[in-house]
Amino acid sequence: MTAQTLPPNIHSTGALPKVKWARGSYLTDVDGKRYIDGSGGPAVYCIGHANQEVNEAITRQLDLIAHGYRYNFTTDALEELADILRGVLGGTLNHIVYVTGGSEAVESCLKLALQYHAAQGQMSRRRFIARERSWHGNTLGALSVSGFLERKTAFEGSLLD
């Protein structure tokens, strides 16, 4: 990654290592140097890179259907996951909405909160609170409720209150 491809809020002190491959919790760069992956995100921390069981499950699903069509159709995989989630969460959920990641999940929750208060006739309840240095995602809505001022500055005027 070069300075031209870095996000504007990230400042590199030099050339970044170029990762060639990864296994488990380790990254290996093009020169063969190994690193513990401290930046891969929650799924990598829990599962690891190149997890054979996960890769095989993904391949099996992709061979059937690559997209879940959550609002127009259902699939065995969607229904099985819903059953697992209901079981883990005590069986009390009536509705499950699948999203692609954390930013979209936060964005959906913000919209749900706004819709709820509008339906209650509480139109003035449109503000959100966040802890300092909190991070909730990359979308404008998720960024709005993040307490990471350095990441918000460039978008002031476009964010939610």
Regions found by a protein language model. Give the residues of each.
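PLP-dependent aspartate aminotransferase-fold enzymes
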Residues: 83-161
